[in-house]
């Protein structure tokens, strides 16, 4: 509607200028008529699109029914083909045509040579039209037709044996608890050692982390028996150390540190560094073990700067000029303002936009139909075939269309990390304004959480069944709704932006009651749960500064989550022109964790 209003305004402005011309005395008489004609044309286009959408859905339903009932008569084929042909100008006409041919080919008999040839001819003609995104589907159908008459031979006895062997190995991998028995009973000459290698890390997870008399010696014997290479044994040791890293046995801890020094594997060294940070022991020897690549990370440059008293200010100053959480920490350590350069994203001219008109119409219609996943697939194909500047312009276009998740996606594909207005669009602003009334949560923080959780995809769903913009679990949503007298009718409500934002911000406010004005703890609890945060605080025993606590969060995901949310909050303050933008609150900085 915003676009329609803008176009209308432009037309009326142009017509008004025309009416003011002394050489067009009759133009003012026709202005109202021109306005009515334009509005009528817009309305007729809208009605036409609604009708086409209805036909699209009806034909799609017919094709689904044909497949389900295994009936696709010639009469039904003719009806559906006629209806598809009537959809001239509809963005998804060729999608439906591909679906029609997919259904028709499924019903072709092997001996129907004439029908197969007719299909090949028509599909070849469609391929020649080179219709965006749909042509590969037609090509795939042609390939399917070319192999339709090929008879599938039964598997040979050798293949059957191979399949049985693979299935047996898969069963072994799926039951890692049995690995010790498999090693004891199996002959190294008959069982592929990759089965053993792949299953070992999962076998370790079946063992208690704090088991007594912990030793790698027995697994070294396995490795010798199965003639594992040095690199394979190294991978086993890494898996073993990762599994039992926090085992409290002092002999194991001594062996662990020796192995970390020998293996010099960054993920283990970084984990040992985090342990040293929360234990408040020396860091330099562990920092020196890092590879050049890891040493270049902002996080370890920050900690190296804190250890180097002589060059502390110089290193922190250099870091503070970059973008990110640790540059913000560096500026805070230096008690300096954090300066941020935000480039302006380019936009399409009308002429530049024309080549994408068909694609934009397709994506618009898919989104209208709720096919956001397919719309994103086509958006990604588009992004992968244009240059960096065009990717930026596409991101800006998507943002202006309120395709917020596609704008973010384009910024990620382009690696446009400095273009914060594209990475962090001002999405669902009115909903946040409404939801945050009378809550002790800032708009920029709530939006930072949503951006980190879903990248502004309202249909996002995690493997744990967290849903929507702020990725709420149905159980959390239900409890939050009850505690705050908010409407909630079930899981599907979480895919509705307003409902999700109401519940997500209410949950943030509940966490704020537990951790007043401390986004570090609120964000960590929102991601990992308040119980885990409680355990981490208990382990820290009120001895850690803000930077030490964040660095020692044991979960990789939560650690990155907290850092991103704090950074996004500050970026949103800049983008929303907040006065005196604040990186950290006094409560966050002054607290010992």
Curated annotation (Swiss-Prot):
Compositional bias of kind Basic and acidic residues: 159-168
UniProt-listed Enzyme Commission number(s): 4.2.2.n1
Record keyword Lyase present: yes
InterPro entries named among the record's database cross-references: Lysozyme-like_dom_sf, Lytic_TGlycoase_superhlx_L_sf, Lytic_TGlycosylase_superhlx_L, Lytic_TGlycosylase_superhlx_U, Transglyc_AS, Transglycosylase_SLT_dom_1
Localization in the cell: Periplasm
Enzyme class: lyase
GO terms classed as biological process: cell wall organization; peptidoglycan metabolic process
Signal peptide: 1-19
GO MF: hydrolase activity, hydrolyzing O-glycosyl compounds; peptidoglycan lytic transglycosylase activity
Cellular component, GO annotation: membrane; periplasmic space
Location of the region described as Disordered in the Swiss-Prot/TrEMBL record: 152-176
Pfam family, one: SLT_L
Highest taxon, organism lineage: Bacteria
Active site: 453
SUPFAM superfamilies: Bacterial muramidases (SSF48435), Lysozyme-like (SSF53955)
UniProt entry tagged with the keyword Aminoacyl-tRNA synthetase: no
CDD domains from the UniProt entry: Slt70-like
The entry's keywords: Cell wall biogenesis/degradation, Lyase, Periplasm, Signal
Region Slt-type domain, residue ranges: 440-529
Catalytic activity: Exolytic cleavage of the (1->4)-beta-glycosidic linkage between N-acetylmuramic acid (MurNAc) and N-acetylglucosamine (GlcNAc) residues in peptidoglycan, from either the reducing or the non-reducing ends of the peptidoglycan chains, with concomitant formation of a 1,6-anhydrobond in the MurNAc residue
Function: Murein-degrading enzyme. May play a role in recycling of muropeptides during cell elongation and/or cell division.
Family label: Belongs to the transglycosylase Slt family.
Protein's name in the database: Putative soluble lytic murein transglycosylase
Originating species: Haemophilus influenzae (strain ATCC 51907 / DSM 11121 / KW20 / Rd)
């Amino acid at each position: 509607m915003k676009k329609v209003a803008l176009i209308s305004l432009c037309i009326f402005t142009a017509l008004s200028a025309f009416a003011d011309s002394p050489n067009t005395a009759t133009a003012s008489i026709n202005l109202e008529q021109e306005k009515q004609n334009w509005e009528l044309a817009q309305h007729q286009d809208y009605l036409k699109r609604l009708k086409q959408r209805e036909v699209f859905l009806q034909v799609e339903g017919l094709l689904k029914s044909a497949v389900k009932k295994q009936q696709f008569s010639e009469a039904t084929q003719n009806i559906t083909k006629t209806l598809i042909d009537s959809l001239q100008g509809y963005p998804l006409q060729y999608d439906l045509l591909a679906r029609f041919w997919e259904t028709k080919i499924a019903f072709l008999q092997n001996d129907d040579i004439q029908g197969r040839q007719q299909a090949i001819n028509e599909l070849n003609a469609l391929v020649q039209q080179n219709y965006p995104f749909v042509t590969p589907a037609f090509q795939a159908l042609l390939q399917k037709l070319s192999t339709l008459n090929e008879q599938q031979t039964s598997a040979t006895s050798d293949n059957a044996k191979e399949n049985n062997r693979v299935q047996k190995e898969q069963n072994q991998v799926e039951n890692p608890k049995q690995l010790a028995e498999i090693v004891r009973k199996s002959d190294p000459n008959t069982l592929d050692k990759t089965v053993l290698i792949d299953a070992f890390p999962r076998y370790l997870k079946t063992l208690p982390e704090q088991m007594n008399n912990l030793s790698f010696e027995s697994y070294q014997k396995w490795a010798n028996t199965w003639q594992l290479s040095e690199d394979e044994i190294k991978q086993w040791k890494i898996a073993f150390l990762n599994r039992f890293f926090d085992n409290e046995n002092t002999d194991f801890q001594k062996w662990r540190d020796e192995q970390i020094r020998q293996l010099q594997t960054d993920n283990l060294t970084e984990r040992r560094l985090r342990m040293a940070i929360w234990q408040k022991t020396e860091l330099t020897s562990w920092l020196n073990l890092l590879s050049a690549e890891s040493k270049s990370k902002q996080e370890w440059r920050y900690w190296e700067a804190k250890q180097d008293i002589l060059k502390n200010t110089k290193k922190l100053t250099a870091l503070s000029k970059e973008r990110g959480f640790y540059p913000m920490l560096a500026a805070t350590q230096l008690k300096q303002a954090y300066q941020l350069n935000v480039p302006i994203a380019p936009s399409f001219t009308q002429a530049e936009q024309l080549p994408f008109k068909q694609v934009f119409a397709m994506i618009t219609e898919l989104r209208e139909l709720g096919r956001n996943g397919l719309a994103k697939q086509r958006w990604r194909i588009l992004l992968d075939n244009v240059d960096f500047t065009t990717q930026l312009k596409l991101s800006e276009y998507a943002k202006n269309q309120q395709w917020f998740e596609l704008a973010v996606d384009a910024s990620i594909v382009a690696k446009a990390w400095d273009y914060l207005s594209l990475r962090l669009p001002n999405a669902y602003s009115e909903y946040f304004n409404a939801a945050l009334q009378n809550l002790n949560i800032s708009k920029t923080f709530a939006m930072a959480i949503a951006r980190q959780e879903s990248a502004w995809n309202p249909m996002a769903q995690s493997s744990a069944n967290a849903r929507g913009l702020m990725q709420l679990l149905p159980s959390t949503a239900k409890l939050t709704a009850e505690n705050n007298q908010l409407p909630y009718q079930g899981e599907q409500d979480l895919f509705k932006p307003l409902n999700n934002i109401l519940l997500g911000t209410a949950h943030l406010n509940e966490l704020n009651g537990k951790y007043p004005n401390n986004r570090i703890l609120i964000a960590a609890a929102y991601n990992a749960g308040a119980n885990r945060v409680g355990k981490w605080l208990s382990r820290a025993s009120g001895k850690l500064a803000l930077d030490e606590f964040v660095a020692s969060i044991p979960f990789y995901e939560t650690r990155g989550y907290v850092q991103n949310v704090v950074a996004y909050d500050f970026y949103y303050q800049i983008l929303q022109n907040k006065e005196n933008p604040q990186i950290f609150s006094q409560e966050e900085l002054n607290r010992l964790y």
